[in-house]
Amino acid sequence: MLCFVRFQAGFVRIIVAARKRFRYFLMAAEDRSEELSSNVENGSCNSNEGINPETSSHWIENVVKVRKPYTVTKQREKWSEEEHDRFLEAIKLYGRGWRQIQEHIGTKTAVQIRSHAQKFFSKMAQEADSRSEGSVKAIVIPPPRPKRKPAHPYPRKSPVPYTQSPPPNLSAMEKGTKSPTSVLSSFGSEDQVNRCSSPNSCTSDIQSIGATSIDKKNNYTTSKQPFKDDSDIGSTPISSITLFGKIVLVAEESHKPSSYNDDDLKQMTCQENHYSGMLVDTNLSLGVWETFCTGSNAFGSVTEASENLEKSAEPISSSWKRLSSLEKQGSCNPVNASGFRPYKRCLSEREVTSSLTLVASDEKKSQRARIC
């Protein structure tokens, strides 16, 4: 309890002393402000007189700093009324030609004339709304001068597109085919024209290649209905067109036959079936199994076997009967048209090999009988 009472008494003493010091500082500040005001008025400043060393630092912080007087270092020349009148006359005569206005006035430089004109024009624009029309004559502000063209400008694209003349070969093709220049290809060969025998049989390069291969292989077949020549059908104008990077041959039919025979229709349908088979099985390593739709035998394993028999062995009636039965089975009928063609080819090859082994065994038996 005694400690607490002593602490409380000491704290009260500190507060009372702080109040006394604060009152003293306030009184001293009022006296200092009065002295400063009197010194500023009289032009004398005796700051060290009547100041205690304890309060000197505090007064230095609170002293109002006097701003340094502003001195104009740049001498701005004013425009007289005579110079301004000459300026207005020169603007009416020369517009924004500052060099000519400088010669007309004679006392101002071009830079000064330009700055004066900018200020004058802005002032005229502000006073244009408030000014009455009859009081003061309006001064016409000259339009700004056009910008100088650059001496060395950057290269720019020409506004007119460059039109390139088509090559002579292309123009010659246009006259013959009467087709637009943007789609025609610049190279057309006679081989592509002669590939197709009729417009119905080929319309692209893939079909034309298939047609040429069939024409070459038809020499080995024994067909009852020969193909028609190009001279019989008639020359048709053919134009080559590039679509998505591929060359397509388009044949324009000059005249179509009025009526088709039954044989021609069968031949055309069989050719379409053959082309579909060629397109599907071109990449197969086992080969192509073709149906005998054109009325002729194919170049498959059956015909090869028959040719080998004709060249090598003597004619045997039983073997030829078996081969003829196999050829009849491979003819064009709806049953054999469907199914997996390589599998059918394998079956036919097995039958042919079995028939060949039988023929060879018969020959050996006959030779043994003759030797005995």
From Swiss-Prot:
Residues 156-169 have a biased composition (Pro residues). GO terms for biological process: circadian rhythm; regulation of DNA-templated transcription. Disruption phenotype: No effect on the regulation of core clock associated genes or on the hypocotyl length. Rve1, rve2 and rve7 triple mutant has no alteration in the period or phase of the clock. Residues 145-155 have a biased composition (Basic residues). Residues 124-204 are annotated as: Disordered. Residues 98-121 bind DNA. Residues 71-125 form the HTH myb-type domain. GO terms for cellular component: nucleus. CDD domains: SANT. Keywords: Biological rhythms, DNA-binding, Nucleus, Transcription, Transcription regulation. SUPFAM superfamilies: Homeodomain-like. Disulfide bonds: none annotated. This is Protein REVEILLE 7. It comes from Arabidopsis thaliana (Mouse-ear cress). The gene is RVE7.
